[in-house]
Amino acid sequence: MMSGEKKELVFKKIGIAIAFSPRLEALIAEAAKMQVGLKSEMIFIHVGNKSEEDVKTINEYLEKYNLLNNSKLIWQEGETVETILNICNEEQLDLLVAGALEKESLIKYIMGSVARKLSRKVKCSMLMLTEPKIESSPLKSIVVEGSNNPKTENTIAVAIEIAKAFKVKNVDVIQETDLNKAVLIRSDEFKENEVAKHKENLIEEEDKRLNYILSCNDCGDIKINIDRIEGKPGYIISKYAREHHADLLILNSPDRKLNLIDRVFPTDIEFALADLPCNLLLVNIKEDYTA
């Protein structure tokens, strides 16, 4: 049951995982935009050997984007994924940001890239940027999951907060409804002529749930569009985001830690991770880092 209680939505502490790649400056530029929009504390994380020249390079970019004196740089050696996860825990991050390729080779996807490994293990929310940009590029379109899940209330609230912070005018809330599957599971309870009515009842329940969630949020001038799409959850919302040229897709974080089997036999979230349609935000209700 949804409580209707307002949760703390602001990403107060954001970690940016950076590496010496062609995307370095673009990731720092994106961090600067986030700091302006969300008023967050920014922590840059680099795993690798430390040299004066490398420190100078990063500091020059931080200064260029007015982040040198109001951000923190953590530089550690170790295995990349585990080191970043440990820093997330130590710093009690609300959001981790990393660059990610839209699509990877099958072998690399199954074995796991750094960004995708982090997304499956991190306790906080995670933003995967497919095309970080140096130049200012307005956020125009957000697609957010509206599934029947205890996390969805918080996820939609976060989507609305981000839309307000970056002056996004349109937010699409997508109900991925596998109605045939839902009816099949309970088909023994209904006669053949009752199946259609049961589908209607399921749709009505979903509409009431989403309307309740939206009524608990101050949407301001944002236009909320609710669409119901019947199909495989995870896959169908990614397809929708791509076809509608969304700038940001926002999903609930996985309900459990994902493993190799989930990549070979994809779960809902793995459909999105396999072929990112745009920037992807996985919203997690922040866990106790001491657990």
Task: Label each PLM-derived region with a short phrase.
Residues L24, E77-G78, K108, T152, ...:
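A conditional alpha-helix N-cap/helix-loop micro-motif detector
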Residues D54-L62, I203-N211:
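N-terminal membrane-insertion helices
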Residues N193-E205:
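A short acidic, glycine-rich active-site loop
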Residues A19, K50, Q76, E102, ...:
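Structured loop/turn residues at secondary-structure junctions
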Residues M2-T57, K64, N69, S141-N193, ...:
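Small/aliphatic-rich secondary-structure junction motif
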